[in-house]
Design a protein with these regions (language model features):
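An acidic, Gly/Ser/Thr/Pro-rich helix-cap/linker signature
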Residues: 20-88, 93
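Substrate-binding clefts and substrate-entry loops adjacent to catalytic sites
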Residues: 56-68, 103-110, 118-161, 165, ...
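Extracellular LysM carbohydrate-binding repeats and other cell-envelope/extracellular binding modules
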Residues: 271-306, 335-363
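Catalytic cores of secreted or luminal carbohydrate-active enzymes
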Residues: 203-225, 295
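Sec-dependent signal peptide recognition
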Residues: 3-10
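Hydrophobic h-region of N-terminal signal peptides that target proteins for export
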Residues: 12-20
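Primarily a LysM-type cell-wall glycan-binding module
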Residues: 232-264, 309-333, 346, 351-355
Length: 363
């Protein structure tokens, strides 16, 4: 139950920034005030409330499911909240990420969308996110959130400054939204665009906006919170929980982990954008963002050698037919054990086109 309290306290506090606890409680408790305020955040009319009954019921019945899915997200949510506030977007847009990925940093869809904001590769690259053999910044919490919020602001301007249109364009694409509006004879009202018979928009998009608004309403509904013994909520401050390090290419993540007393696997949870346990190779002056728990920052400053220079570089080798770890180790003048260690291999079996990281000693 403590986790449930913590989870809902965090989610409901997402609609406030820098609020005192007493102000927060009265704000949430006034359900008559909350619903219009939330709808206004999406530029929606009050009559849209009638659309939400089914979605709200489904979400309310799945409270435990959401708890289990998001209990590892406490580190990320305050960061997203802060960034939303800094960009001047409605705080309800936290729930866009919830619907997109359930706050799973490495979420991957069957259509190749990835990350907490579920960017497709081409969209991500157009927004300045780097994707290559070594890194996928769609899984970088900070950079992907900045890109998503910037993209939503762009869509807001393109759609005539209507947030509900921007949200739907984020899901189905701006071009697809324009086509729907054209088919509706230029009518941009939500009731028209969500028409179940005319089906101007794909079913996924019609449900998408409903889910986001419903979640905003549910997790700020005083009766729902009271019925779940969650009426006493502590407003968790919108403080950053991760510190950003600027480290140069080639640095092993294991060194960073050791300097702050974390396991490599624990550090990777905050840095899923790196595909391997080292920073991508590249120019000596290129830097990458590495994230650590904020409370570990002083340890890092004490223990990490900022003048560290890797004594080896890394390249990728694609396994060809007939190759073995023995032949590859000989080709690159390394050892089988080193190849296993760097690539996390538990045995010597390889598959064609498998990518292996090869450490190359610098001369």
């Amino acid at each position: 139950m403590k986790k449930l309290h913590k989870f809902f306290a965090l989610l409901t506090s997402a609609l406030l920034t820098n609020a005192h606890a007493s102000e927060y409680y009265s704000f949430v408790a006034s359900s008559e005030f909350m619903a219009p305020k939330i709808l206004q955040s999406f530029d929606l009319e009050l009559d849209f409330l009638g659309e939400q009954d089914e979605q709200r019921a489904a979400i309310e019945s799945s409270a435990q499911y959401f708890l289990k899915r998001f209990e590892n997200s406490y580190t990320f949510i305050p960061i997203i909240r802060n960034m939303i506030a800094q960009e001047g977007l409605p705080q309800e847009f936290l729930f866009v990420a919830m619907v997109e990925s359930e706050f799973i940093i490495n979420a991957q869809s069957s259509k190749r969308a990835s990350g907490i904001w579920q960017f497709m590769p081409n969209t991500a690259k157009s927004l300045g996110l780097e994707i290559n053999d070594y890194i996928d910044e769609r899984k970088d919490l900070i950079k992907s959130t900045r890109a998503a919020l910037g993209y939503l602001k762009f869509l807001y301007e393109q759609t005539g400054q209507q947030w509900y249109l921007a949200v739907m364009a984020y899901n189905c694409g701006y071009g697809r939204l324009l086509k729907a509006i054209e088919q509706a004879d230029g009518d941009t009202s939500l009731n028209t665009l969500l028409d179940e018979e005319k089906q101007y928009l794909p079913p996924e998009t019609r449900n998408y906006i409903r889910k986001i608004v419903a979640m905003s309403l549910v997790f700020n509904d005083a009766d729902f919170l009271k019925n779940n013994n969650l009426e006493y909520l502590l407003n968790r401050g919108a403080t950053d929980t991760l510190a950003t390090l600027k480290l140069k290419s080639g640095v092993p993540l294991g060194l960073v982990a050791n300097s702050i007393g974390l396991s490599l696997n624990e550090l990777k949870k905050y840095n899923m954008h790196f595909k391997y346990a080292f920073l991508p190779p590249g120019p000596a002056d290129k830097e990458y963002n590495v994230y650590i728990p904020y409370e570990k920052l002083s340890l890092f400053r004490q223990n990490f050698d900022t003048n560290y220079k890797p004594n080896s570089a890394f390249i990728l080798h694609k396994v060809q037919k007939g190759e073995t770890l023995t032949s590859i180790s000989r080709q690159y003048k390394t050892t089988i054990n080193e190849l296993k260690r760097v690539n996390g291999l538990k045995n010597s079996f390889l598959s064609i086109n498998q990518k292996l990281v090869i450490p190359i000693l610098k001369t």
